[in-house]
Structures are given as structure tokens and as C-alpha cells.
Swiss-Prot record:
Transmembrane segments annotated in the record for this chain: none
Alphabetic keyword roster: Hydrolase, Metal-binding, Metalloprotease, Protease, Zinc
Entry superkingdom: Bacteria
Domain MPN: 102-224
PANTHER family noted in UniProt: DNA REPAIR PROTEIN RADC (PTHR30471), UPF0758 PROTEIN YEES-RELATED (PTHR30471:SF3)
Keyword Hydrolase: yes
Upper classification of the organism: Bacteria, Pseudomonadati, Pseudomonadota, Betaproteobacteria, Burkholderiales
GO molecular function: metal ion binding; metallopeptidase activity
Listed name of the protein: UPF0758 protein Rpic_2712
Protein residues bound to Zn(2+): H173, H175, D186
GO annotation (BP), single: proteolysis
Entry's family note: Belongs to the UPF0758 family.
Segments carrying motif JAMM motif: 173-186
Keyword Metal-binding in record: yes
Length: 224
């Protein structure tokens, strides 16, 4: 049965307008994006098929064009629309991190990091540089590596902290494997950076490890 023939309160678009997007399932939200299904399948049926095929909404969003287009009814146009939508979300979150903003919500930082680093196929080490009142001065991606590691140079981080006249930093890097548990080398590096930056009177507030669906914070786990 086509969605247009469903009772109005069950149609995804009408349901969203009546109750807000949080009331919809992943499949219903995806169906609104898809707009139409394929012969024999409604947009909701197609959305469920996509989610079942990829395993989750996050994996669907991070699928390659070839993987995405392997599903009947999906192609370059839908792939482009999806990634345009994701980029809009990234940029909207990034606007929340304007110069001079005070960091008050750990969750907003995590959301930004997931959208910015969670999908990267290689490790990226980045840093928020903050002033004495913990307002944002700059966000920089400093080092890029392989699937399993990024070579990090404490001296370069110290140079950037001095360049920005930062009083504090939040460190972040991603684990492309999706496992956000810190490795022994992550713990050792964090200690080294804390010591090195302390000599410059720069405080390391946190170190966050970013996966596709989760962000691990050293601070909240008592490792700072």
C-alpha cells in the first residue's frame, strides 16, 4: 500500500508535523528523505530495507557511493542529496563553535566531533584552543595518519597553543575502527601532552576519542 493511502496520523510527514521529528523512527525519518519508494515498496519499506542492509543509520550515512547505489532505487542523485544533508548538519553544528563561544555543553562538543571526525577513514588528531575563560579561539586538525594511528608531535601542539595564546585545550582524535576505548599509547600520549603543555601554563581539559556512534571522554572516565 502506498503511503498516500495510509491513515493520515501514520504517514511520516504528517506525524512529524503533528508530533515533531523525535516521534519518528529511523525508517520514518529516512522515508521522508527518500520521498518515494520503488515498484512494490513504499518509501518506508525501502527505508527499512536500507537500514537492514547497512545495519544502522550511521553506517548508511557513511556508506560509499558504490555501496549506496547497490540498493535498488538508490543512485548518484540520492547519494548526493544524502551527503548534502549531512554537510548541512555539520556546518550547522560548526556554527555553534564560533570564536569567543564558551564551552558549556560536553554533549554539543561530542556531537560536533562525531559529525566532523566520526566518519573519517583514517586517524585525525585535532584540538580546540581555548582562552582563560574557556571560550573558543580556534579548532584545528593537526595530524593525519592511517587506519590505526596518527603520529602526534607534542612540540607542534605546543607551538599552536602559543600561536593562539591559548590557556586551555581539548584534544580529540578518531578511531576509524569504531572502538573508542583508549589504547595504552593514547593514555601515554595524553599524559605527555598534559606535562608538555603544563610547562606553558596551558591546561588540557579533556581528551576525546571519536567513533561513528560514540565519543569517549578521558575526563568523564576519571583519566585526566
Amino acid at each position: 500500500m502506498a503511503i498516500v493511502d495510509w491513515p493520515a496520523h501514520e504517514r511520516p510527514r504528517e506525524k512529524l508535523l503533528a508530533h515533531g521529528p523525535a516521534a519518528l523512527s529511523d525508517a520514518e525519518l529516512l522515508a521522508i528523505f527518500l520521498r518515494v519508494g520503488v515498484p512494490g515498496k513504499s518509501a518506508v519499506d525501502l527505508a527499512r530495507e536500507l537500514l537492514a542492509h547497512f545495519g544502522s543509520l550511521a553506517r548508511l550515512c557513511h556508506a560509499s557511493q558504490q555501496e549506496f547505489s547497490s540498493i535498488n532505487g538508490m543512485g548518484p542523485a540520492k547519494y548526493a542529496q544524502l551527503h548534502a544533508l549531512l554537510e548541512v548538519a555539520r556546518r550547522a553544528l560548526k556554527e555553534d563553535f564560533t570564536q569567543g563561544q564558551t564551552f558549556e555543553s560536553a554533549q554539543s562538543v561530542k556531537d560536533f566531533l562525531r559529525l566532523t571526525l566520526g566518519h573519517r577513514p583514517h586517524e585525525v588528531f585535532a584540538c580546540f584552543f581555548l582562552d582563560v575563560r574557556h571560550r573558543l579561539i580556534a579548532w584545528e586538525e593537526l595530524f593525519r595518519g592511517t587506519l590505526t594511528e596518527a603520529r602526534v608531535y607534542p612540540r607542534e601542539i605546543a607551538k599552536r597553543a602559543l600561536h593562539h595564546n591559548a590557556a586551555a585545550v581539548i584534544l580529540a582524535h578518531n578511531h576509524p575502527t569504531g572502538n573508542t576505548e583508549p589504547s595504552e599509547s593514547d593514555v601515554i600520549l595524553t599524559r605527555e601532552l598534559c606535562r608538555a603543555l603544563a610547562m606553558l601554563d596551558v591546561i588540557v581539559l579533556d581528551h576525546m576519542i571519536v567513533g561513528r556512534n560514540h565519543v569517549y571522554g578521558f575526563l568523564e572516565h576519571g583519566k585526566m
